[in-house]
Amino acid sequence: MGLYRIRVSTGASLYAGSNNQVQLWLVGQHGEAALGKRLWPARGKETELKVEVPEYLGPLLFVKLRKRHLLKDDAWFCNWISVQGPGAGDEVRFPCYRWVEGNGVLSLPEGTGRTVGEDPQGLFQKHREEELEERRKLYRWGNWKDGLILNMAGAKLYDLPVDERFLEDKRVDFEVSLAKGLADLAIKDSLNVLTCWKDLDDFNRIFWCGQSKLAERVRDSWKEDALFGYQFLNGANPVVLRRSAHLPARLVFPPGMEELQAQLEKELEGGTLFEADFSLLDGIKANVILCSQQHLAAPLVMLKLQPDGKLLPMVIQLQLPRTGSPPPPLFLPTDPPMAWLLAKCWVRSSDFQLHELQSHLLRGHLMAEVIVVATMRCLPSIHPIFKLIIPHLRYTLEINVRARTGLVSDMGIFDQIMSTGGGGHVQLLKQAGAFLTYSSFCPPDDLADRGLLGVKSSFYAQDALRLWEIIYRYVEGIVSLHYKTDVAVKDDPELQTWCREITEIGLQGAQDRGFPVSLQARDQVCHFVTMCIFTCTGQHASVHLGQLDWYSWVPNAPCTMRLPPPTTKDATLETVMATLPNFHQASLQMSITWQLGRRQPVMVAVGQHEEEYFSGPEPKAVLKKFREELAALDKEIEIRNAKLDMPYEYLRPSVVENSVAI
């Protein structure tokens, strides 16, 4: 009983306020009180109420709210509600961060994270059960294509729960940038429709100067072997390269190649031989674009790491050997320049296909979607792991629906310009699912498996390890607050259900690929949650942010190839130009690359979310330390990059987005 001071915070996004009245109730351990005053929440404002409550409520557990309307339901985005009790009592925060629609009653639990074991009296048990029951109706598993990991049910944006939709500033920026890209494409098409492309410099007609200094560097130096090799270490797709343990069985040496074999074996013995194998593309059906057959290869590249850190190609094999056929030719740096350049173009095109489908879409976007759906179905908002992970799930469902309806849909961008479009992209995604191993999502294990630990010129490896370690310590700090023993982990039914839902349902039985179906110890929880957060932040950034830099100059990353892979070494400039994308394909690649790869004006850097899901000083101290470590890493990378000829920026915490939001 006594005077209560209530503050209500409304989101700042367009339309976040509401013309509807909002009524509040306070629910304590010993009673409940309806507040006589009502409020009209205004966008970006805090509304304060002071109410005399005659009843004794005891410690506050919930704030309940109901938005009433007469003629029109006007949705309201509520950030949080705080309550200060009589006298000099502590202020208690009730996080919301969601849209309030309709006229039903919404209960907001006090912001302290609680596992089931931390609620021995069961004060929140009914709320947990009812919230998850409602969530499971909203968040249902779907199956975009048979044979793939699962996704959120619903084929259209408006099938998504309102809380998964872009806020207005994000929506406007995304749609305006898309319209701008398509308008520029139309202009370029009209200017080039009657012109013939005869020279590689003709690609300058569609190149957007000034968008990226690194893209201009790529345009000027893309033919160099050093830049070709560098991309496997620090380019848009740094997850293919591995140190060779032996010469690949597919590498068949034709007569007269004994010297090459000896050179490779020497590098192998010295531990400086690396490979990039694109065998996953073998057998994938190539696209047909406007009645014109496109083509795919499945290259193998062998590279040597020099003492100065440069990674240089030694040999390229474009196709796998076939029984009963002569071995495929091996292309060498000493071959005629156009033959060697064309072979490298084939590798870059193959890397483009695997990058966009396997590394980016499957391992970034679709994996993050599994984490989102499982989290919303299995962890109530009061659970500490939910509070920890929810900032890293923002906007993922909408951007993925947009991808499925615009990029990889029937007649989408992939079908229009990609050599894997027209169904090959789905076939490739299915086959790539076999390589979704638990260890490959965890940089300490993945980099060790690929032999990249200690490679000083692999800035991706260095930065990924550092960011992983910082995230791990952050997760460990929160986990240690709520799980004092391993038994507490084993006895948390919501945590176990969440883990099992990801592995068995979302990932379609991934326990045979190392994913856990249960968590038995605190360190296992830390590792698993760190994997989830790193996948949604650092790993996605590492394969997303480089697109504008490395793919703007189309010959460096051709979206399709219009002639078959060469079987001889008599290539000419005419052969190269006839193989690379035509002007429309190249223009569309450039436009989409700009729209998706540009730095986003509406973004939240990793760890910098404004939402406060936790109450209490201890979790806030953990978050503060996390942000300090991120800032220190960002500064270290900045200092290192200042000394580099080609800075590596993609894992700088200040540019890594907090979720898969683009």
Curated annotation (Swiss-Prot):
Pathway(s) it belongs to: Lipid metabolism; hydroperoxy eicosatetraenoic acid biosynthesis
Reactions performed catalytically: (5Z,8Z,11Z,14Z)-eicosatetraenoate + O2 = (12S)-hydroperoxy-(5Z,8Z,10E,14Z)-eicosatetraenoate; (5Z,8Z,11Z,14Z)-eicosatetraenoate + O2 = (15S)-hydroperoxy-(5Z,8Z,11Z,13E)-eicosatetraenoate; (9Z,12Z)-octadecadienoate + O2 = (13S)-hydroperoxy-(9Z,11E)-octadecadienoate; (5Z,8Z,11Z,14Z)-eicosatetraenoate + 2 O2 = (14R,15S)-dihydroperoxy-(5Z,8Z,10E,12E)-eicosatetraenoate
PLAT domain residues: 2-114
Superkingdom: Eukaryota
Alphabetized GO MF terms: arachidonate 12(S)-lipoxygenase activity; arachidonate 15-lipoxygenase activity; iron ion binding; linoleate 13S-lipoxygenase activity; phosphatidylinositol-4,5-bisphosphate binding
Main EC class the enzyme belongs to: oxidoreductase
Location of this chain's protein in the cell: Cytoplasm, Cytosol; Cell membrane; Lipid droplet
Entry note: cofactor: Binds 1 Fe cation per subunit.
Entry binding sites for Fe cation: H360, H365, H540, H544, I662
PANTHER family the record matches: LIPOXYGENASE
Record protein name field: Polyunsaturated fatty acid lipoxygenase ALOX15
Gene transcribed to yield this protein: ALOX15
